[in-house]
Amino acid sequence: LCLDGLVPFHRYSQGAYNHFYTINPNEIGTITPGSTGLGNYVYDGAVGNIYDTPGPDPSLTVPLYRYVNIHNSRHFYTTNWQEIGTNTVGAAVGDWKHEGIAGYIYSTSQPNTRPFYRYYEQSNGAHFYTSDPNEIGTTTPGTAGKYGYVLEGIVGYVA
């Protein structure tokens, strides 16, 4: 497994229910832990490393699509664009507008990778993603952890 070309996947937060993830820290303007950038997003740190291109072995990676809710600016990330219904940048389906590919992650577990978990908090309609299961406290699908987040599953794998 070649890890060349990996870049940090940065997480920013606006409280417990609005998170933004990017490989481009210029979108928010800071990578200083705890500092506030554009949109009042606070830098949390990197949640892992992903590729900005399909990587040295494209057969092992998949695009991680980024969508924004047009009503509340919350973001949603998935490797399965059919969950929203479009993979056309700028197109909107329902409440979600496709912003592009956030990066490329492994579709299956590889050496030196860890799961990238997706959680959902229903009352706020918020998603949370992490490679550290201790942040929410559960890795059992359907089980609620901290802040009411329920594990939906593993999106893919990050280094």
In which residue ranges do the predicted regions lie?
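Extracellular glycan-binding segments that recognize GlcNAc-based cell-wall polysaccharides
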Residues: 1-159
